[in-house]
Amino acid sequence: MSSERRPELEETAVDPATGSAASRKFSIVQDAVETTIVAPTNHGPSPRFSTLVRNLFEPLVNLSAVVAALRKKPTEAKAHIASQFIKGWVEEVGKDIYPAFRLILPDKDRERAVYGLKEKALGRLWVKVLNLAKDSPDAKALSEWKQGGNESAGNFSKRCYEVLSKRTSLTDYGHMTVDEVNERLDLLADGETDQAKQIEILTYFYKHMNATELKWLVNIILRQMKMNATEKVFFEPWHPDAESLFNVTASLKRVCWELTDPTKRLTSAEAQVSLFACFMPQIAAFPKYSGQDIAGKHFKGRPFYIEEKIDGERMQMHMSEYGNKFHWWSRRSKDFTETYGNSLDDASGSLTKRLRGIINPKVRNCVLDGEMVAYDPATKKIIPFGTLRTANRNEQNDLNLTKPMFMVFDILLLNDKPLVDYTLAERKRTLRTIFARTDNETVGQEGVLEVLPYTEATTAAEIETCMRKIIAESSEGLVIKDPTSVYRVNTRDDSWLKMKPEYMSEFGEKLDVVIIGGYYGSGKRGSILSSYLCGLRADGSDQFWSFFKVGGGLTAGDYQAIRTKTEGKWKRWDKNDKPKNVLLAGPNGDLERPDVWIEPSDSVVVEVKAASVVASDQYKVGLCLRFPRFRALRLDKTWEDGLTISQFAELRQTVEMEAENKELELEDRKRRNAGPGRGAKRLKLANVSSDEDELGTDERPTSVFKATSFAVLSDMSSPRYMSKAAVENLIKKHGGTVFQTVEGPHTIPVADTRTIKVQALTKRVHGVDVIRPNWLLDCINEEKLVALEPRNLLESSAETLALAKTNVDEFGDSYTRPLTYKEMQEVLRFMDQFDLDQTNPPDLMMEVLETNDGAVPKGMLFYGKKVYMSTSNMDTVALETQFRAYDALRCLQFGGANLVTDMKDLVVAVAKTEEEAKELRRVSSEQVFPFRVVSIKWVEESWKNGTVEIEDDYPL
């Protein structure tokens, strides 16, 4: 096979209506030599579309029956089905299998334009085709396709089948051929914006296909075949080099038309990345290890490269003839040449005209791999990916507008020489030589085309240092690469690993928990359990309390193993007949209720890890795991080996102590690095105690709580976190008695959050006073029982609250004890606001006073969330920003936010300006657990929408 046929340049127009010769050939060009590739000629007529449905699609979906009949493994059964179909096609139709492959692998077909139809739009079209009333059950079934308890929930094509099978006039398969279906689909793609044309085409399909055929037609239009088979299943029986050619050309047509003889193999040159042939790029895998283990276990002390993970669009650049020809493709093989330019002289392109003089004049041709980003010339920063489309449209002569910039991290071809088999280290060295400007730190030209910098490292500490740097710069994450690896097209393996900040702060222990419930998924998982409810065992009992849901990290093999072990043991959740051994949260015991549940004794133990543990009223334990990930199925353990509530509490205390030790080590490093005389001096105020005093950490026992009984009902969240067990130990250390339940009127309930126990207590005992743990710290610091203040009350009677208010002035300043430094800052801040409030009463304050009929009152919108927002240097910002900042601060206060001045254990910081945001990100990067930095708009949008918005959506 001639090497001249490698790179595809352009294809002649296709006329699906006439089937003219123009659709039977296309040209490829290399070094000015044009070769025309002609489609093979079939000797038989186009078969019916039903042939694909009956002989391929349905057998692959109902694989278990085929496996049983053939007595083969599932992978062998898939290969058998595909090879038999291909063999039959070649014998009965001919060697041009492209018409069939377009329908079998619609997501790989670059020749057909997009339909512009997803599930929602397609559902509306079917409603019109079937002439359904909008409020009819079937119309609702199509629009609400993810809902319902039947098998079709989450599977749009199955939902369409249920609706269409009631109405279609055809009970047997239709007579439409493969060619006819392709022609109509081409027309549907051409009529992307013409709804009348779309309805006409779908109506034709409806009249000429039965419900099963229509189900598969829907999958083809959505380009989601849902038949549990990748392109490899079909490529292997077609030609031994089919996958290799597709990986370096991304062309289904070339695979079908060039590889018609399985005995003729590709040369090594033809299987290489080549000019103007879109290849499938290598992508980074998720790590199996933590940062510590990546350095130690994965690389075993060998060097590795650390790159910043760029927030952009993966792009490959092909250049030839010293810049006279360019071609650009995305990761999904979408052609962006018209957008970015086809030559250095292309005035309409948004990038190539700016590349003149950047690429070394000795470079005749090259293929580069990188990330296309949006660049702001004013700030000289890369800005969020969502702005890239706007940057592409901006007028290039306006220097103040955002523009696309190409961040290059790999080179795969240089002056006709493929480099994919060279090591990454060799490719990196080559990459630096192809750009004319290498006289400063930036290789390439800033704002136009740059080579992505990298750091060579060998230790986990270097990974953590880089991670903290990208947190400070509000970047996306890191990519860690093996410098000895070759480039592997269309591969995701551990030679490239991607890490995000969340992966760095895992809850340090593996947890063995029991699955107690399951949830059905959507899409591919519509008919199977895609996530599981896990629980902790109540000590000395066979009851399990709900703890968290997990779905991440499970492979197809894991799902299958769990299904095998639990088959036939699942039961539908019945709110009127709840299980005795599976307990959920909520007054009615139905929060986070699963679709199905299982007796713990019939279930399995799974090993999970998570980013952190957070308080949650949604789960019976009162806590849940943040970002849990499945690690392993523990078939060596039974339900009795599952983690108990008390075991988890002990484990959590150990983890917290390790985190505190790590923080102390970090502080020691900072002090050592600061040098003598560099530490900031502490200001001591009259009637103000230190922050250390506030924490009540004095090791000297006292008898301050002698003859006093407490029942601790939750962890302490402010002024710092302390577990329930730690609070109980603190009480005992200072002479108090601890009960696990409220034993009569002389037992003081203590809690910082409204857990299930607190809610049950307030329902059972009207007007009960629930004291916050900060009162315990006040008493220990003063070495006596101090008067209650409003800040000490979680729940109270009107009388207790009125009495507590008499112990502070109108600004919250205590009459009975010295304030801590933090409290004094809060009082001063409130006093400043008090004068402003008298003259400019904001609408938001009045809004808080109104009755809220939503699920979450605005008075609790930010409840429990630790937020930092400074009002210093307000006179240096614009007047409008000042008003917005004060309004945002009031929203946080009235919404129950825990406003703090210390960055320790912070969750989110609100910045007024970009300069402040930059400084906050720097501080965040130095914390053991980094916090999020958001703009004022995060507060405004959360308040307006009545829900706390995702912080990552509001950067500054």
UniProtKB/Swiss-Prot annotation:
GO terms for molecular function: ATP binding; DNA binding; DNA ligase (ATP) activity; metal ion binding. Residues 666-700 are annotated as: Disordered. DNA ligase involved in DNA non-homologous end joining (NHEJ); required for double-strand break (DSB) repair. SUPFAM superfamilies: BRCT domain, DNA ligase/mRNA capping enzyme, catalytic domain, Nucleic acid-binding proteins. Its cofactor is Mg(2+). Coiled coil: none annotated. Keywords: ATP-binding, DNA damage, DNA recombination, DNA repair, Ligase, Magnesium, Metal-binding, Nucleotide-binding, Nucleus, Repeat. Mg(2+) 1 binds at E371. This is DNA ligase 4. ATP binds at E307, K309, I310, R314, E371, F409, E476, K481, K498, K500. NCBIfam families: dnl1. It comes from the Eukaryota. Mg(2+) 2 binds at E476. The gene is LIG4. It comes from Yarrowia lipolytica (strain CLIB 122 / E 150). It is found in: Nucleus. Its EC number is 6.5.1.1. It holds the Pfam family DNA_ligase_A_M. The active site is at K309. Residues 700-793, 857-956 form the BRCT domain. InterPro entries: Adenylation_DNA_ligase_IV (IPR044125), BRCT_dom (IPR001357), BRCT_dom_sf (IPR036420), DNA_ligase_ATP-dep (IPR000977), DNA_ligase_ATP-dep_C (IPR012309), DNA_ligase_ATP-dep_cent (IPR012310), DNA_ligase_ATP-dep_N (IPR012308), DNA_ligase_N_sf (IPR036599). One of its GO terms (cellular component) is nucleolus. One of its GO terms (biological process) is DNA biosynthetic process. Belongs to the ATP-dependent DNA ligase family. It catalyses: ATP + (deoxyribonucleotide)n-3'-hydroxyl + 5'-phospho-(deoxyribonucleotide)m = (deoxyribonucleotide)n+m + AMP + diphosphate.
